[in-house]
Amino acid sequence: MITLYIDADACPVKQEVYRVAERHAEKGTALKVFVVSNSPIAVPRDLVSGGPPDAKPGTTFAGGPLVERVVVGAGMDEADNWIAKRARAGDIVVTADVPLASRCVKAGAEVIAPNGKRFTADSIGMTLATRNLMDSLRSAGAITGGPKPFAPRDRSSFLAALDQAIVRLTRAGFGKATG
């Protein structure tokens, strides 16, 4: 089974994850989505209850609900810690949080940013170093501002990256139903 973890509090592509996951589940890929946040986040009711009423006959949504909400404590990094503790090879993590991405990549998970950028074992070290440098420069007042605004192109890149990750993991044998 493929497990997708969404670092959901500020994630702009939650709806895209639901659509892609539902499409792959209807094709027989065994997967589960965990929407992890510090406060309750709305998710499509039909995906939480075990599948939409118009789902193809025989679609099991991995034996139950396709999407599960997880509300963690309000403390700093609670959602990150919950995800990092569970992420492993065969899982996909959706996050823009570079330290969380680093922890999940080290655990063997596929990690994708909402703009479609893949974090890999080869790239995460430099990405983390750049993030830490920029954080230091911002703290010193040398740099103001933040990342570029989220654009439609970012959404398209994310959709392609997520679809590719699910296909790659399915081909590696992770998308098969267990039991």
Can you annotate each of these PLM segments?
Residues 2-179:
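Nuclease catalytic cores that cleave nucleic-acid phosphodiester bonds
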